[in-house]
Structure formats: structure tokens, C-alpha cells
């Protein structure tokens, strides 16, 4: 009898120890210690947007171009945003990338500015996620990413016609006049009212070629092309959508340095659904797995860094 009672006591103690170990192994959110806005001011040349560790996508806002100030495409001291491109250099001190600039907007489709002031106090960024409100258009923008795909979610708040500018000519350059010449060759095809595919060959810091697939979760109801300037090879497309106030459009962009098929496979493998929250969570998990290698008990942290 005593032996049986002893067995149950040992079993209970082991169970308590097991539960305490499980509780102590609850994953810590290391992303909360990271502040992507560090280095965004003069001339830190960092970007606040979304990416995953060692990914080829860095989807982020652009606030200016054509000078050394904008090697990463963004300066937090600026008051307006021109759009959101799919890849960026970080802290390099040289301009390049900034491929496929996308801007959601509303109202008159022939908008001469194609930029908006933004609410800095509501701007958010943590590893794998970025959000901002374009105050002139009343559009909330959210960005996340996988290794080879970017995902955008645009929520249109105003009761005005909803549009998206897809600028395939844009890129981060040293001088504004290079915006017309840095694209050496370009091909683009509209597959249907949901998909755009193509390739660009560009030369800024180096000559390179990339292939893309752009997909929308809602069909565009109309499309226009902006008049190209002399020397430009790629197109700027204006897409219109039939939305009610509060509805959103999601955009996915797959990139490849090999082929359009490679960009499509990236979407199929890494981002097959229209589940923004799932991709956002997976991106945060990828960062947490990497950041967990750091022993925070040895560091006194008062602010995100």
C-alpha cells in the first residue's frame, strides 16, 4: 500500500515539474524589441517596411527619389508618401532597387500628384509588418512579406472611386532624369482582370533583370495607361475597382530573377491564399526564430532597438 502511495506521489511531482517546464518554455515575442524606424532619418538609408530574414523582398514606402538622401527610398522627416515598392537596399549608401511602385488612391483618376500625406502618429512597423494611413486618400495600407513575395492590403475608407497605380517604370535612382532611362527593356502582359505579368531589365548601380507576377483579389473594372515620357520603356497603369467604403483590395507580388514561371511558383509555394494575417504571423515567426538566438538576459533593454 505504501509503495503504491509513493508511486502516485512521484507521478504527481513529475507532472508538476512537466507543467512548470512547459510554462517556462512559452515563446517570447522578440519582435517587440525591434524598432524598424531607427535609421530612417537623414541619411541613415534604412527602410521601415516588411521583409523576412534573408528574403529578396523588402516591401516598403517611398517618400522621395533622385538624390543620395533616398538610397532606401524613405525618409521619415518627409510629409508624404509616393507609393510602396517591392525591394530596397538597407543602409548601403547607394541607390538601387525600388522595383514596381504601387500606390492606392481615390477620387479623380487623373491625379497629377500621385502621392499623399500620411499620419505619422499612426504609422506602425515591426519585423515582417508595416502599416500607415494615407490621409489625403483615406486609405489604410498594410504590408507583409515572404521570401519571394510581397503582400499588400489596402482598405479604402472614403465613398469615392478606388484606384491603384502600378508604376513599372519607377525605381530608386541617383538623379531624377535617370527615372526615364534606368529601364533598359520591359515586357508586360495583362492576363485577366486579376493578373499582370512581365519582366524589366534595369541599370542603376548594376545591370539586372527581374520577372514579376502581380495579382489582385478583386477584379479591376477599368484600366488606363499614363502617357510615357521620352525614353521610358515600362508602363504606368491606373486600375479602377468597384468598392464600398471600408472594403479592401489585396495585392500579391511575386519576384524572380529567372522567369515569370519562377515568380508564379513563388506565389504558389509561399503565398497561395489571400490570408494576410497568416502571412503576417508567419513572417513574425521567422523573425522570432532568428532573434531568439540572442540572450536578452545579458542585455538591459529600455527601448526597442
Where are these regions (language model features)?
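Bacterial N-terminal signal peptides that target proteins for export
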Residues: 2-10
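Bacterial Sec-dependent signal peptides at the C-terminal "C-region" and cleavage site
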Residues: 18-28
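Bacterial N-terminal signal peptides
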Residues: 10-18
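Ser/Thr-centric signal marking residues that sit
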Residues: 305
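Accessory carbohydrate-recognition regions in carbohydrate-active enzymes
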Residues: 26-302
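Short, intrinsically disordered low-complexity segments
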Residues: 2-3, 21, 179
Amino acid at each position: 500500500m505504501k509503495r503504491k502511495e509513493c508511486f502516485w506521489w512521484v507521478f504527481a511531482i513529475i507532472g508538476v515539474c512537466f507543467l512548470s517546464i512547459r510554462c517556462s518554455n512559452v515563446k517570447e515575442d522578440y519582435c517587440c524589441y525591434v524598432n524598424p524606424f531607427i535609421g530612417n532619418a537623414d541619411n541613415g538609408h534604412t527602410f521601415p517596411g516588411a521583409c523576412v530574414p534573408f528574403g529578396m523582398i523588402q516591401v516598403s514606402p517611398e517618400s522621395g527619389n533622385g538624390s543620395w538622401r533616398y538610397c532606401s527610398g524613405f525618409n521619415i522627416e518627409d510629409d508624404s508618401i509616393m507609393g510602396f515598392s517591392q525591394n530596397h537596399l538597407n543602409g548601403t549608401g547607394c541607390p538601387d532597387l525600388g522595383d514596381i511602385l504601387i500606390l492606392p488612391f481615390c477620387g479623380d483618376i487623373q491625379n497629377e500628384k500621385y502621392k499623399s500625406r500620411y499620419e505619422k502618429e499612426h504609422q506602425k512597423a515591426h519585423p515582417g509588418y508595416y502599416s500607415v494611413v494615407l490621409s489625403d486618400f483615406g486609405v489604410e495600407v498594410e504590408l507583409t512579406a515572404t521570401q519571394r513575395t510581397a503582400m499588400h492590403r489596402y482598405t479604402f475608407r472614403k465613398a469615392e472611386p478606388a484606384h491603384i497605380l502600378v508604376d513599372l517604370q519607377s525605381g530608386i535612382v541617383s538623379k531624377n532624369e535617370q527615372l526615364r532611362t534606368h529601364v533598359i527593356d520591359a515586357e508586360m502582359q495583362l492576363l485577366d482582370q486579376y493578373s499582370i505579368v512581365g519582366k524589366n531589365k534595369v541599370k542603376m548601380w548594376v545591370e539586372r533583370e527581374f520577372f514579376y507576377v502581380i495579382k489582385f483579389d478583386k477584379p479591376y473594372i477599368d484600366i488606363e495607361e499614363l502617357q510615357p515620357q521620352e525614353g521610358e520603356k515600362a508602363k504606368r497603369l491606373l486600375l479602377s475597382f468597384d468598392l464600398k467604403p471600408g472594403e479592401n483590395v489585396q495585392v500579391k507580388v511575386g519576384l524572380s530573377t529567372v522567369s515569370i514561371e519562377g515568380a508564379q511558383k513563388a506565389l504558389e509555394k509561399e503565398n497561395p491564399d489571400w490570408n494576410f494575417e497568416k502571412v503576417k504571423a508567419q513572417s513574425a515567426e521567422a523573425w522570432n526564430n532568428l532573434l531568439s538566438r540572442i540572450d536578452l538576459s545579458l542585455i538591459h533593454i529600455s527601448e526597442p532597438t
